[in-house]
Amino acid sequence: MTREQSARLLPQKPSRWAKILLNRKVPILLFLLLELAFLVFSYLSLQEHFPSIILWEHLLSVFTFFYLLNRSMDSRSKLSWVIIIALFPIFGTALLYFSLADLGVRRLKKRLEDATVQASDYLSTDPEVADYLSQSDRQLQRLAYFLEHSPAQFPIYRDTEVTYFPLGDDMLPALLEDLKKAERYIFMEYFIIDEGIMWGEILAILEEKAKAGLDVRVMFDGMNEMTTLSYDYIERLHKVGIKAQAFSPVKPILSTYYNYRDHRKITVIDGQVAYTGGVNIADEYVNKRERFGHWKDTALRLDGSAVQTLKALFLTMWTVT
């Protein structure tokens, strides 16, 4: 299967001119530039009509500098902000407070926290596993305790077979074979999905399974709609029976919302088999296309009860998206 053939497993994309006219990038970038220009114009107008505002801005920058020094924050982030404010006092201060305000994100965080709490009710460590660790390896027991009592509350599992793939090239055949064996559902969540040979082979199976009545869901980061996928890709997936969502899609509004991206790479099949790791769904990850030389990213295949955690992670994100 060639890259050109695999990219056409879904209905043909719009023509070149239609794509240019309907591309979401154009209006989104235009609106963002207009918003930025409005903010700059408003600021310059204030300076012109109220010269004393400059003094207050510098005083605010000094206050912000000391506020940063006493704030609980990663030292590298703190240093970065200090440098920005030192070089660009007014712009840096405004940018910091805009970032801290997290406009448009608080409701998302609340929904994610609530969904995580609900998911944790279904995930718990088997007491026998904890007893086994306490008797076999104290170091592993401490690590397990840390994971179980972390904010995410990851349970510990024992009866799970793990297969390591040193390359995406090694992972793909196994993934395709497991997808073909699916009987109930397939959940896929990826940071990058790019049309090509890899996605074409996966998509052919997903479409077949969806027609057979399986629950097939695909979720990708919203930035894909600006980079690798067409603006109507979710609708095109729906037409072939695949449920699809984009996490944090880019909209024509200035917001720190866009800092929150979904970098997960997860496939869950029937709650029994799962894949995760660093391999996205794009041809360079399986060396079907050379982009930056020979591409190396690793992946894991899980077969057993530990898959339940990955299933919960997927459904949690699916619920809040």
Which ranges hold each PLM region?
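N-terminal localization/anchoring segments of enzymes in phospholipid and broader phosphate metabolism
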Residues: 1-321
